[in-house]
Amino acid sequence: MIVLGIESSCDETGVGVVKLDGEGNLEILADSVASSMQEHARFGGVVPEIASRAHLESMVPVMREALRQAGVDRPDAVAATVGPGLAGALLVGASAAKAYAAAWGVPFYAVNHLGGHVAVANLEGETLPHAVALLVSGGHTQLLEVDAVGLPMKELGSTLDDAAGEAYDKVSRLLGLGYPGGPIIDKLARRGNPEAIAFPRGLMKKSDSRHDFSFSGLKTSVARYVEAAERNGEVISVEDVCASFQEAVCDVLTFKAVRACRDVGAKVLLLGGGVAANSRLRELAQERCDKADIELRVPRFNLCTDNGVMIAALAAQRIHEGAQESPISVGTDPSLSVETPQVF
């Protein structure tokens, strides 16, 4: 069975194609993505209207490229992200998916974007046991308890202010490094000293929430450090600032992720979202999981950021388990919860 997935929740227009065999195994046939990232760069973040227009312009070319890569004229099913995400962006992808499904005469499946990140993190793994997922991106920082791919997940904790990826973008802008901040800071951090500056770790006291996150204090601390240096006429090491900031973020993320695994008795940690491509996060997560006897499952780099493969993969796994197709009337939901069925 050939399943095509469309992703358009933010600034990437993604179309992925997977092949599902009778045993439930998946093979990636196509992964086509167009990003409007550079169009948002001068604004320092994603502008919803620009993102929606970019999806409209990119959808057909990206679809054609995905079908070319897959070597198929049409799939056996079409899936699309219907939430959470930017309202206009979601409408473009979901509407396109419904139109293609109707034109091809194949079933349509509505997919939860966050469930897609979990599914792709387990794409190359064995059957998923009880697990915890750490989803980290520009819009989300969440710890989720996962019993099975595609089923409702329980939120154990989330950020109380900035998402981790958002903090990267804001610190990058503060340092004059550009957008998006994640890859830039990660690259510079490799040349810096992560212990040079003692930036704070939010919500790490015993009295604090065990599974929630906070990055606004860290962001403010970086700003004050830079302002103080400029006021005193000191030359700062941008590399050291990046390394120390990144260490603080990754320290908190991995510490709380492993703690969550222990608290719920999970032996697998799934890492997903755009920030999952961060080299230090992957390294520290592996170190701490090894010490805690927890298996870490991380998607390949190109599948960390938003893509259509993860949507196709989640739909395919649920189809294999007998999921019914979605009504063509199903709407989009920018605030869709993880605690709902992931394909509906």
Curated annotation (Swiss-Prot):
Catalytic activity, as annotated: L-threonylcarbamoyladenylate + adenosine(37) in tRNA = N(6)-L-threonylcarbamoyladenosine(37) in tRNA + AMP + H(+)
Region (Disordered): 325-344
Cellular component annotations (GO), alphabetically ordered: cytoplasm
Gene Ontology molecular-function annotations: iron ion binding; N(6)-L-threonylcarbamoyladenine synthase activity
GO biological process: tRNA threonylcarbamoyladenosine modification
Sequence positions that bind Fe cation: H113, H117, D306
Localization annotation: Cytoplasm
E.C. number: 2.3.1.234
Cofactor binding annotation: Binds 1 Fe(2+) ion per subunit.
Keywords of the record: Acyltransferase, Cytoplasm, Iron, Metal-binding, Transferase, tRNA processing
Main location (coarse class): cytoplasm
Cofactor requirement: Fe(2+)
Binding positions for substrate per the UniProt entry: L135, V136, S137, G138, G139, D169, G182, D186, N278
Reported function: Required for the formation of a threonylcarbamoyl group on adenosine at position 37 (t(6)A37) in tRNAs that read codons beginning with adenine. Is involved in the transfer of the threonylcarbamoyl moiety of threonylcarbamoyl-AMP (TC-AMP) to the N6 group of A37, together with TsaE and TsaB. TsaD likely plays a direct catalytic role in this reaction.
PANTHER family linked: TRNA N6-ADENOSINE THREONYLCARBAMOYLTRANSFERASE, TRNA N6-ADENOSINE THREONYLCARBAMOYLTRANSFERASE, MITOCHONDRIAL
Family under the similarity heading: Belongs to the KAE1 / TsaD family.
Name under which the protein is recorded: tRNA N6-adenosine threonylcarbamoyltransferase
